[in-house]
Amino acid sequence: MKKTLVQKLGLLGVVSFLSYAAAVVFAPLAYPGYDWMAQAVSDLSAANAPSLALWNRLTALYNVCEVVCVTVVCIGIQGRKSRLFRVGVYLFAAMEWTSAVGYRMFPLSDSGYAGAFQDVMHMVVTAAVVLLSIASLVIIIISSAKDKTCLSYGICAAIALFMMLVGALGMKIVPASCFGIVERFSVFAATGFNAALGLHLFLKGEARPVTATPEREA
């Protein structure tokens, strides 16, 4: 069956993931002394980071592709029966938009945390992103347990949530020298799930609206 434009746009989630992964892997080359095992990914995009220019080039497709992907996914799931599932995806979309706009407006002013206004706002954006991420993934997992047609979404959401928890808990447990390792579990969870949503849309297509079957006359 021929793929629709909406389905094809779902592949932008994969493009977004690859753009972000390229930045995480190659941006440290422009940051002398950067220790990926100990430092956060956000240090690479700090306002005064030497790697900022390269980071911006490598992530040129990241934000725009991620928000377009999750937006067309919201369009593509309109016909699904499970309202709970749709709410979960809408919350995830809200998280992606918050992340795309918030982190662009308020990057860290310095590597680590310098305490400036934009650093405080960066933390506020992070808190909103974390809460929306967890809420959306939990709702999608619950909806998949109730509606088996959403099971594959639930499995992907469970993997993403597990990665987030590993990152969040790991950052509290592991020594500072390993902070960057566990932190990367968290940062790749959301963009990975976004890619999964886009692939679902591309492979499964748009859900058709469910219409009530007219009752037959006696």
Predicted regions and their residues:
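Small-polar-interrupted transmembrane alpha-helices in polytopic inner-membrane proteins
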Residues: 89-104, 158-167
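Interfacial helix-start motif at the membrane-water boundary
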Residues: 44-64
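Interfacial segments of alpha-helical transmembrane regions
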Residues: 6-14, 80-94, 150-157
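Terminal transmembrane helical module of multi-pass membrane proteins
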Residues: 140-218
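Internal transmembrane alpha-helix with an interfacial aromatic "cap," most often the third helix
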Residues: 61-87, 135-145, 209
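Alpha-helical transmembrane segments of multi-pass membrane proteins
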Residues: 17-36
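Membrane-proximal helix-loop-helix units in multi-pass membrane proteins
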Residues: 99-139
